[in-house]
């Protein structure tokens, strides 16, 4: 099938998924024509490669040797760095942002917010961090790179100098969610436990520019529920495959089950009801790593 056709990508993905159905979720990740074979041990890797090659041979598919890498501990996949530690930011993307100086017009600010959007899953509270930039995008006549913008820009660079490493949950593993709300943003982070240490899986953040005007005026409790709803929309594959425990001091479960609250909360309850979501109080923090992560995520 020619890749110029509109449905070529989805058709190719469907065919590849059907071909490698027996290996998906075990030792292989596929996105259209990009394939990653992952193994924990060298000997296992040889067996996994043999199984993949047999499938390719049965379907008479060929690999481009110049684009193949074997026995590597890390590599780029879909714009990210995949290593034994987890999913990391592509250093080239950070380098582009670090090379930027004071921005001179809304177009340059728009380019910056676009580059930051690519890294959203790695940036805690990205909507809060980038709010000064969003406020400048439409100011063509009265554009001014203020001290607030310069400070926010430097803080973004400092954060990206030590970006977090994203972890991938195991099948059927219980994962956790923390939420924070602000006047102009709602935020959520998914976390998994690995060896007693909690590691981030994905950050989600929505700014006032992305929220409807009415949503900006929601009560904090409603914004907290909205953060969970936005999380299910953005990360539906995680919420469908895992039990998600939302850790919060707010009584979200009570409100969602209440028949006396607003119509929109009832609608949200219906949306969230299809997922296996539990709500627990954030009563204790185990380990300094988690303490630092939560402090970074929840600080004003």
Residue ranges and their predicted role:
Residues 1-11, 196-226, 248-256, 262:
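A short, polar/acidic, helix/strand-boundary loop motif
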Residues 4, 90, 180:
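Short, conserved phosphate/pyrophosphate- and ester-handling motifs at nucleotide-, phospho-/glycolipid
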Residues 7, 26, 31, 54-57, ...:
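C-terminal reverse transcriptase regions that engage the nucleic-acid substrate
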Residues 9-46, 122, 126, 233-243:
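Active-site palm subdomain of RNA-directed nucleic acid polymerases
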Residues 14-15, 48, 155, 223, ...:
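Well-ordered alpha-helical segments embedded in enzymatic catalytic cores
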Residues 173-181:
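Two-metal-ion RNase H-like nuclease active-site motif
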Residues 181-192:
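Acidic, metal-ligating active-site segments
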Residues 298-300:
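Long, charged amphipathic helices and adjacent flexible linkers at domain junctions
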């Amino acid at each position: 099938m020619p890749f110029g056709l509109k449905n070529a990508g989805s058709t190719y993905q469907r065919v590849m998924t059907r071909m490698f159905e027996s290996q998906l979720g075990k030792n292989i990740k596929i996105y259209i024509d990009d394939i990653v074979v992952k193994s924990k041990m060298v000997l296992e890797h040889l067996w996994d490669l043999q199984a993949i090659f047999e499938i390719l041979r049965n379907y008479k598919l060929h690999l481009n040797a110049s684009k193949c890498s074997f026995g590597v501990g890390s590599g780029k996949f879909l714009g990210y760095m995949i290593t034994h530690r987890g999913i990391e930011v592509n250093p080239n993307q950070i380098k582009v942002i670090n090379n930027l100086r004071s921005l001179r017009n809304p177009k340059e600010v728009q380019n910056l917010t676009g580059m930051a959007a690519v890294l959203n899953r790695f940036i805690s509270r990205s909507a809060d961090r980038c709010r000064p930039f969003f406020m400048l995008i439409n100011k063509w006549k009265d554009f001014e790179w203020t001290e607030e913008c310069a400070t926010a820009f430097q803080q973004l660079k400092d954060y990206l100098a030590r970006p977090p490493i994203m972890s991938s949950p195991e099948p059927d593993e219980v994962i956790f969610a923390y939420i924070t709300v602000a006047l102009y943003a709602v935020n959520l982070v998914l976390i998994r436990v690995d060896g007693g240490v909690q590691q981030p899986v994905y950050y989600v953040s929505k700014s006032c520019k992305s929220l409807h005007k009415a949503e900006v005026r929601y009560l904090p409790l409603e914004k907290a529920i909205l953060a969970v709803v936005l999380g299910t929309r953005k990360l539906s594959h995680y919420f469908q495959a895992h039990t998600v425990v939302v850790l919060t001091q707010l009584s979200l479960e009570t409100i969602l089950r209440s028949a006396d609250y607003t119509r929109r909360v009832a609608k949200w309850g219906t949306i969230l009801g299809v997922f296996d979501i539990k709500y627990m109080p954030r009563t204790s923090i185990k380990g300094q790593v988690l303490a630092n992560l939560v402090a970074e995520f929840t600080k004003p």
